[in-house]
């Protein structure tokens, strides 16, 4: 299945502790169906000190399921993503506005 959400997309969280917050996707894992959104779904990771890094409690963004994310359109509202053919190429478009993403 084609990727409806890609790295660099601005998204809003639909469910969970960060519901309603917006951020940018930093990485997507199609195999697990999850994405990491910058600054959202933060968990504290405890790391041991090593020669090149200081240990302690380090905040880290954890993956969010793609079903709990929606693309933000040009109006700033959450939208679903569709596909259509334009000039022989498959492009993504916002279902609310019809604009190409």
UniProtKB/Swiss-Prot annotation:
Metal-binding recorded as keyword: no
Gene Ontology MF, one: structural constituent of ribosome
Cellular component, GO annotation: ribonucleoprotein complex; ribosome
GO terms for biological process, alphabetical: translation
PROSITE patterns in alphabetical order: RIBOSOMAL_L24
HAMAP family, alphabetized: Ribosomal_uL24_B
Subunit field text: Part of the 50S ribosomal subunit.
NCBIfam families on file: rplX_bact
Family affiliation: Belongs to the universal ribosomal protein uL24 family.
Protein name: Large ribosomal subunit protein uL24
């Amino acid at each position: 299945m084609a990727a409806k959400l890609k790295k660099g997309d601005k998204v809003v969280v639909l469910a969970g502790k960060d519901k309603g917050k917006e951020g940018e996707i930093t990485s997507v894992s199609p195999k697990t169906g999850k994405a990491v959104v910058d600054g959202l779904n933060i968990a504290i990771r405890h790391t041991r000190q090593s020669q090149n890094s200081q240990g302690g409690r380090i905040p880290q963004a954890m993956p969010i399921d793609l079903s709990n994310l929606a693309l933000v359109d040009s109006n700033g509202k959450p939208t679903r993503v569709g596909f259509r053919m334009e000039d022989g190429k498959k492009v993504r478009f916002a279902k609310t506005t019809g604009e190409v993403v």
